[in-house]
Amino acid sequence: MNIVFRVDSSTKMGTGHLMRCLAFADEFNRQNKKTTFICRNLTGSSINLVKQKNHKVITLPIDTGFQSDNFYLDLLGATQEVDAQQTIEATSENIDLLIVDSYALDETWHKKLRPCVKKILVIDDLADKNIDCDVLLNQNLGSKKEDYKNKVPDDCRLLLDCEYALLRLEFGKLRSQALEKRKNTKRIKNILVSMGGNDTKNFTYDILQNVGDGFNITVVLGMLSPHNKMV
């Protein structure tokens, strides 16, 4: 089975889209399925992390002169039409499943890829656009079927709410240990702060400024975060 991911990461965009796709891809690898990532080589991209996890990576070129009034297209670094054509040209093999995780891509892009793939799965959070896919995953708390009324095909399978959260295998292995520790904890002493890989708006710093004394605080922040020194 040939599975292709179309997902990006960058200093401006962060790493969240990529990390949840990696959770997917690592599980597919454990099942001996072939995985390929198609990523635009944006500034601050975490493409090397994908390679370290033994997934094939195909990089799309950067158009340094591209600009868009659309916030998400500006992050994407290309129009949907150009991105779709580059994605098609990047894949010479038949694709069994195309997994797309991008706020910038809607049915315009999906329809152009349809002839090249058997199935499309879209990971979404916003429910703010029309999407042409066979399966839609929104793992966020409170996401519901009504959010996607008239926005997806009638036969689209919806995977909604936290029941479908994309968590790495490590979380599952430690779940029983964590639950046992929670039962025996009477006072909170340790606090973990994680606001994403890049935290471009520096929410981490704001939180640290407002946490009282007497706690052991651990911060998780990516190496490319622009606010590392301040934190």
In which residue ranges do the predicted regions lie?
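A conserved nucleotide-sugar
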Residues: 34, 211-224, 229-230
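Nucleotide-activated donor-dependent transferases that construct or modify glycoconjugates
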Residues: 1-14
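Short amphipathic alpha-helix
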Residues: 18-28
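A nucleotide-sugar donor-handling region in carbohydrate enzymes
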Residues: 132-201, 227-228
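Conserved nucleotide-sugar donor-interacting segment of glycosyltransferase catalytic cores
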Residues: 104-152
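A conserved mid-protein helix/loop that constitutes part of the nucleotide-sugar donor-binding site
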Residues: 19, 198-210
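Short N-terminal targeting/anchoring amphipathic segment
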Residues: 88-104
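Conserved nucleotide-sugar phosphate-binding/catalytic loop shared by glycosyltransferases and other
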Residues: 31-85
